[in-house]
Curated annotation (Swiss-Prot):
The record marks Y73 as: Interaction with target DNA. Its cofactor is Mg(2+). The gene is nfi. This is Endonuclease V. The keyword Membrane does not apply. Its main location: cytoplasm. It is found in: Cytoplasm.
């Protein structure tokens, strides 16, 4: 595995990320959520993609793609492992969203190219990274109450907002993926909350990918 070449690709791709608002439709009609996981000891990559109407946040479509994993897990290079399955799920959608929430990092990455940014560049769609853990940067400790907020900083640059979406839950790291500013990324995530830790697009993507009870009951109630 030529990590030097992958690192150079990351730096080059990151320079093409648009960090300001360039939504084709604002507000969007459809918002997607995307989540990637692995099966069979990592040999299979599974990507779930859901489509929600906005502003109702009603689930209207979901697709799951499974492909052979193309590279091993290497910290800092996860997007190269995840994007092929995301592209496969993207191609399965009957209609394309105006905005995509990706479970993972956007520019809040050591070389400013997390999976939300990488995928956004590949399909040229506005994306937001919604991550559950910090990958780089520093932030001031958050108060315990919901709504607590702090910038994630690295080398004098704001990479994300650290936001406690729910009491007694760890905060989310919300970042520009592509064609969405960091402040708008936070605002869109906040508009898509329904009382859970995760915003509805990535909550549903996770539920579909992992066949959680919410998704099982949803499918049982479909005609």
């Amino acid at each position: 595995m030529d990590l030097a070449s992958l690192r150079a690709q990351q730096i080059e791709l990151a320079s093409s990320v648009i960090r300001e608002d360039r939504l084709d439709k604002d507000p969007p009609d459809l918002i997607a959520g995307a989540d990637v996981g692995f099966e069979q000891g990592g040999e299979v990559t599974r990507a779930a993609m859901v489509l929600l109407k906005y502003p109702s946040l009603e689930l209207v479509e979901y697709k799951v793609a499974r492909i052979a994993t193309t590279m091993p897990y290497i910290p800092g290079f996860l997007s190269f492992r995840e994007y092929p399955a995301l592209l496969a799920a993207w191609e399965m959608l009957s209609q394309k969203p105006d905005l995509v929430f990706v479970d993972g990092h956007g520019i809040s990455h050591p070389r400013r190219l997390g999976v939300a940014s990488h995928f956004g560049l590949l399909v040229d769609v506005p994306t937001i990274g919604v991550a559950k853990k910090r990958l780089c940067g520093k932030f001031e400790p958050l108060p315990s109450e919901p709504g607590a907020l702090a910038p994630l900083m690295d080398k004098g640059e704001q990479l994300a907002w650290v936001w406690r979406s729910k009491a007694r839950c760890n905060p989310l790291f919300i970042a520009t993926g592509h064609r969405v500013s960091v402040d708008s990324a936070l605002a869109w995530v906040q508009r898509c909350m329904k009382g859970y830790r995760l915003p509805e697009p990535t909550r549903w993507a996770d539920a579909v990918a992992s066949e959680r009870p919410a998704f099982v009951s949803y499918t049982a109630n479909q005609p």
